[in-house]
Amino acid sequence: MAASCLVLLALCLLLPLLLLGGWKRWRRGRAARHVVAVVLGDVGRSPRMQYHALSLAMHGFSVTLLGFCNSKPHDELLQNNRIQIVGLTELQSLAVGPRVFQYGVKVVLQAMYLLWKLMWREPGAYIFLQNPPGLPSIAVCWFVGCLCGSKLVIDWHNYGYSIMGLVHGPNHPLVLLAKWYEKFFGRLSHLNLCVTNAMREDLADNWHIRAVTVYDKPASFFKETPLDLQHRLFMKLGSMHSPFRARSEPEDPVTERSAFTERDAGSGLVTRLRERPALLVSSTSWTEDEDFSILLAALEKFEQLTLDGHNLPSLVCVITGKGPLREYYSRLIHQKHFQHIQVCTPWLEAEDYPLLLGSADLGVCLHTSSSGLDLPMKVVDMFGCCLPVCAVNFKCLHELVKHEENGLVFEDSEELAAQLQMLFSNFPDPAGKLNQFRKNLRESQQLRWDESWVQTVLPLVMDT
């Protein structure tokens, strides 16, 4: 009797979904140029999914983009009438019972919520899904695809289980379960994209998943910033962050001066200050796969070199981003007592971030990759702005950073400090390494995202 009741209850729950799925399949046939894009994260901090949506819209698809709306996406996305952003609510864990139980309940509730959100949207010919995070979104998107006739496209940025392993350890039962889940449901997708050739080979060899490498490329708005725009940005940031403010007042009280530039009141001409500090930029999501103690230790060594009389400039170090370890590193930064270095950690508007990269002298990347198979998009953006980079070494970094060509690769804080000393000696030096790297980046004529997407992704969605 109890078994019959359970079967009847399951049918009652499943029948409406099957009927709705059949109706959506019919609807999908009438809307073959529609794509649903899903990221179980902050849309504003998911540039690659924003770029997918913009490229799809540019080539005639309408796009529904589902994700958390914690930060503002780029204006191009918001102003495109082919793209609709649907906000998801980030569910909080229950503060009851063991942590494993709390996590399990959250995953189940998140799955039901995402299923409900997807089933009541216009069905798409494709569901584009960012992974990670893939728990529970891979299974839910596959299930919705089965009901609605949509083809699931997974864009592999990394492995979710490897990120969990940084917190819990690689052999934790939750991590092993997440790996099995990711591997099993990942094989059920229709198309797979990934960010490096190393990941493509790993997916093929160890997961039996065929993927196409779609390298991260800078969007068109990542470019060198004209001096006039640099000055406006510095003045804007100076109103909120003291490192951008002028170190001394100009002789003419109507002259506008920042820490790096000044605008002549009469002609409106902007010039760089002769004794300006060097501007070093790093971007981070403040997670375990980026050890910012390396940068802080290198800055301490740089400070000591300056105090010892080496011909080095003052430094303004800007670290942008949001994430769980931001407060921890902010406390470490405040404990430092630098005389020649100023560090600030702003969260920039989407439109200001490319302008900052295009205004900086050097980028630093501390991303090491939990899997060793993904590449830091921040470096891609920096290269788009012709900004040379010092990057910490890991397995497949050579696919992006060419040592002594477009930047430098380091292993530890000692090596990074030596690189900073070499690059900033006699700053600004027109004949120095920094300018040579910048020249190489200008001459490389790298593909932009739109051009790369047309060559790699568009044929896949047009042919299948």
Swiss-Prot record:
Its EC number is 2.4.1.142. Changing L88V: In CDG1K; decreased function in protein glycosylation as shown by rescue assays in an ALG1-deficient yeast strain. Residues 100-120 dip into the membrane without crossing it. Changing R438W: In CDG1K; decreased function in protein glycosylation as shown by rescue assays in an ALG1-deficient yeast strain. The modification Phosphoserine is found at S242. GO terms for molecular function: chitobiosyldiphosphodolichol beta-mannosyltransferase activity; mannosyltransferase activity. Changing S71F: In CDG1K; decreased function in protein glycosylation as shown by rescue assays in an ALG1-deficient yeast strain. Disulfide bonds: none annotated. It is found in: Endoplasmic reticulum membrane. Changing Q342P: In CDG1K; decreased function in protein glycosylation as shown by rescue assays in an ALG1-deficient yeast strain. Residues 1-2 are lumenal. Changing V281F: In CDG1K; decreased function in protein glycosylation as shown by rescue assays in an ALG1-deficient yeast strain. The chain crosses the membrane at residues 3-23. InterPro entries: ALG1-like, Glyco_trans_1. Its main location: endoplasmic reticulum. GO terms for biological process: dolichol-linked oligosaccharide biosynthetic process; protein glycosylation; protein N-linked glycosylation. This is Chitobiosyldiphosphodolichol beta-mannosyltransferase. It comes from Homo sapiens (Human).
